[in-house]
Amino acid sequence: MEASPNDRLHFGKMGFGCKHYKRRCQIRAPCCNEVFDCRHCHNESTSTLRNIYDRHDLVRQDVKQVICSVCDTEQPAAQVCSNCGVNMGEYFCSICIFYDDDTEKQQFHCDDCGICRVGGRENFFHCKKCGSCYAVGLRNNHRCVENSMRHHCPICYEYLFDSLKDTNVMKCGHTMHVECYNEMIKRDKFCCPICSRSVIDMSKTWQRLDEEIEATAMPSDYRDKKVWILCNDCNDTTEVHFHIIGQKCGHCRSYNTRAIAPPVLPQ
């Protein structure tokens, strides 16, 4: 008994692919005319070439030809194989030339980002100033930084915009990978590597520093010494009494401060 057209479409689902995606086709990279399982496989391969001038990334939209993994037929990019009739990807984006059999990821294409995302369209919104899709919980609930996602992670330096790893938006609006953020916190680093703002609530730490300073008298030579500081949390500049333990911002009460030269007053 012959398989129905619908059964044929789903033949081999989740049975092919690479470590990045389950799909029933390979792509021919137009930049080097080589065949790879996916764009990431291409980029990983070319990034290790001996000659640095040969290293390059594949532009996803440039892919024109794919090879069906079921029947090995090379053909123009499309969802259904022109020869054997299988879906080469249960999810297919004709803009990104993106195939994926694992639809539990809830893939969707964002026109503003220009690429496909995962997690379900209803769970995300596109922030035009930050230049990327964010979880709906961040709508009107994050500090906008222009094109904040179109940068490299400040810890591992992987480009964030199209990274496969989860990304964290910090209180300051800057972004980094979730795993890099967690590792940073684990190592007792609580400031953004880019702007130095505190990334978590530090009020209890500031309270402990208040108590330490109150219990630690400075030598008489330093009791009246004052310094100018810049607060990394509120960007205010103030003149405060110097203390070896730390200088407290007179505006927001943070100890995340640094000494600066006195301001030059206009003549």
Curated annotation (Swiss-Prot):
Zn(2+) 2 binds at residues 31-32, 42, 56. It is found in: Cytoplasm; Nucleus. Pathway: Protein modification; protein ubiquitination. It is an enzyme of class 2 (transferase). This is E3 ubiquitin-protein ligase MIEL1. One of its GO terms (molecular function) is ubiquitin-protein transferase activity. It comes from Arabidopsis thaliana. Interacts with MYB30. Interacts with GILP. Autoubiquitinated. Zn(2+) 4 binds at residues 93, 96, 109, 116. Keywords: Cytoplasm, Metal-binding, Nucleus, Phosphoprotein, Plant defense, Transferase, Ubl conjugation, Ubl conjugation pathway, Zinc, Zinc-finger. A zinc finger (RING-type) spans 153-196. Transmembrane segments: none annotated.
